[in-house]
Amino acid sequence: MQEITPITLNAPLVLLTGAAGWLGGRVAAALTTGLPDAGLLANGSFRVRALVPKGEDISELRKQGMEIATGDLREMQSVRAFVAGAEGAVLIHMAGIIHPKNVAQFEAINTQGTINLVTAAQKAGVRRAVVMSSNSPVGFNPHSDHRFTEESPYDPHAGYGRSKMLMERALRAEVAAGSTMEIVIVRAPWFYGPNQPSRQTLFFKMVKEGKFPIIGSGRNRRSMGYTDNLAQGILLAAVHERAAGDIFWLADETPYTMNEIIEVVGMVLHEDFGMTVKPNPFRLPDIVGGAATILDATLQYAGIYHQKIHVLSEMNKTIACDITKARKVLGYAPKIALREGMQRSVDWCVKNGQSF
């Protein structure tokens, strides 16, 4: 258990979207019960109201004492109902879509849905909005030693990156126009941690079976964010005075090579959980990643999204960021590194019936 770091929220109400999701669920826990294993707890006399889509499992949110509003970011009526009576509140917007049924959903949800929410929140008198973005608006690093900063130019990769770029531009335009609501953008890369979706468990399974494809040398680097580290940064962005109107990268302390990520997952499975991990013979030439990138772009241009092709297109790319600004301005201090974070992730899978 980590030493507890309380973060005080001076607001009567916290509005939270994406609370039933992977990362949003950890933010929800930090706001309510706290995350003692990560040393994280939000202090203050505030209520938490979550916006969840129809059909989501809200049992855990109920246990945490949250107010529940059911609705869709694309429907202004439900968005207005969610922010009703929210004067002086803090909004933490985590909802979005990464792997859609079709490409059109990217902008409908990530871009227009966010604009709908921010517009309604401003009119309701919300004091500050913290909005989750991604590494995707800036694309891929030019080489493995390069790190993105908050000043890196936009160069989005495919539909998801474009939707997040358009979202960020709309938010920055609000800030430039003198928005009465403070707006903070936080960017997170590939994240990992408890409550993971099946796609992350499949990653573990492929590593265990020696079937995860390494494209190229495997020396390309990826920033990753353990979910509780990211939750810390999100709460700091919600409270720090100097965060208003700014953008921050949040991630683990340092990027990892793909070789290192796969090696650590294999070590955790074998050494910590006694699983047999097969050697990985799947090393494919860089041209496979290039071909996947072209195919992904072609399909998305036609409005088609294929998750496995899209993910494959990124596997030989460096996507790495510098968290110096978040450390200096927010006091962000990620406490959990790759080995411990992966151990906790696998432990959660084992305890929750996700088999490899």
Swiss-Prot record:
Pfam family name, one: Epimerase
Coiled-coil ranges per UniProt: none
UniProt organism field: Sinorhizobium fredii (strain NBRC 101917 / NGR234)
Full protein name: Uncharacterized protein y4nL
UniProt function note: Putative nucleotide sugar epimerase/dehydrogenase.
InterPro entries: Epimerase_deHydtase, NAD(P)-bd_dom_sf, NAD(P)-dependent_oxidoreduct
GO annotations of cellular component type: cytoplasm
SUPFAM superfamilies, per database record: NAD(P)-binding Rossmann-fold domains
Cofactor(s) essential for the protein: NAD(+); NADP(+)
A single MF term (Gene Ontology): aldehyde dehydrogenase (NAD+) activity
Protein keywords: NAD, Plasmid
Keyword Transferase among UniProt keywords: no
Taxonomic lineage: Bacteria, Pseudomonadati, Pseudomonadota, Alphaproteobacteria, Hyphomicrobiales
Similarity comment text for this entry: Belongs to the NAD(P)-dependent epimerase/dehydratase family.
